[in-house]
Amino acid sequence: MWQLLLPTALLLLVSAGMRTEDLPKAVVFLEPQWYRVLEKDSVTLKCQGAYSPEDNSTQWFHNESLISSQASSYFIDAATVDDSGEYRCQTNLSTLSDPVQLEVHIGWLLLQAPRWVFKEEDPIHLRCHSWKNTALHKVTYLQNGKGRKYFHHNSDFYIPKATLKDSGSYFCRGLFGSKNVSSETVNITITQGLAVSTISSFFPPGYQVSFCLVMVLLFAVDTGLYFSVKTNIRSSTRDWKDHKFKWRKDPQDK
């Protein structure tokens, strides 16, 4: 019965008035999280969306052109500049996702961050990424031309709670052997106002979609079980009432 209820509940949900605009939006995630990468880096894009039991394929788009891959993850083994651009995905029970930008750069070093605009008290994670992950030492992170953090061996730079003073231009530099190399400069902006904690802090957008869908399915299954049990109880009660009992006296009662 359980195998029948789950697919049936989902199909009823889709067929009973769910229009395209009512479907949840798919979400694209980058893994690792950096949207700026160097040539030869490997990148995985993951599509989080809702699927029906009959169709678990995914449509991928690169700069609005359909990609042949139909898996939920799209893997780029060795990125080239041609891989730069916007990526979107869609499933049969999710609408087209918002675009996710991928930038493939040429160079020895690249300063990476999940984003460049933060709110006060947000954590900031910076990474001085080297081409092909070549060993890098005597690494310095600089803000507005002044050294901010030094590492003898390459390490990520963390700012636990951003303040307005953390706004500015950043780059990193280090040594490849005896060769001194630097990344391009990027601007980090800190805006006023504390970050507000919401349910999205605990559930990424894609998981919110799955969570809501699961709750609807559980409600449908629970309703189905209720009516099934109620019908069985009525049937048992009716059979008990219709049954005729015959009584007889025990010989000892004479």
Curated annotation (Swiss-Prot):
- The protein depicted here goes by the name Low affinity immunoglobulin gamma Fc region receptor III-A
User: In which broad location class does this protein mainly occur, judging by the first location in its UniProt entry?
Assistant: membrane
What's the reported outcome of changing F211A?
Decreases the association with either CD247 or FCER1G. Decreases cell surface expression
Which UniProt keywords are present, listed alphabetically?
Answer: Cell membrane, Disulfide bond, Glycoprotein, IgG-binding protein, Immunity, Immunoglobulin domain, Membrane, Phosphoprotein, Receptor, Repeat, Secreted, Signal, Transmembrane, Transmembrane helix
Assembly: Forms a heterooligomeric complex with ITAM-containing signaling subunits, either a homodimer of CD247, a homodimer of FCER1G or a heterodimer of CD247 and FCER1G. Interacts (via transmembrane domain) with signaling subunits; this interaction is a prerequisite for receptor complex expression on the cell surface and intracellular signal transduction. Binds the Fc region of antigen-complexed IgG with a preference for IgG1 and IgG3 isotypes. Interacts with CD2; this interaction is involved in NK cell activation and cytotoxicity.
Q: Which residues carry this modification: Phosphoserine?
A: S236
Q: Give the note.
A: Encoded by one of two nearly identical genes: FCGR3A (shown here) and FCGR3B which are expressed in a tissue-specific manner. The Phe-203 in III-A determines the transmembrane domains whereas the 'Ser-203' in III-B determines the GPI-anchoring. FCGR3A in mammals is the true ortholog of FCGR4 in rodents. The FCGR2A-HSPA6-FCGR4-FCGR2B module was duplicated in great apes through non-allelic homologous recombination, giving rise to two FCGR4-type genes and to FCGR2C, a hybrid gene combining FCGR2A and FCGR2B. While FCGR3A kept the original FCGR4 functionality, FCGR3B rapidly evolved and acquired specific features coding for a GPI-anchored receptor.
**Which effect does the record note for changing C212A?**
Has no effect on complex formation with CD247 or FCER1G. Decreases cell surface expression
> Which Cys-Cys disulphide bridges does the record give?
C47-C89, C128-C172
The reported result of mutating Q208A is: Decreases the association with either CD247 or FCER1G
Mapped to this chain, the residue ranges on the Cytoplasmic side of the membrane are 230-254
Transmembrane stretches, start-end: 209-229
Question: Which cellular components does GO assign to this protein?
Answer: external side of plasma membrane; extracellular exosome; extracellular space; Fc-gamma receptor III complex; plasma membrane
Q: Which residues are glycosylated?
A: N56, N63, N92, N180, N187
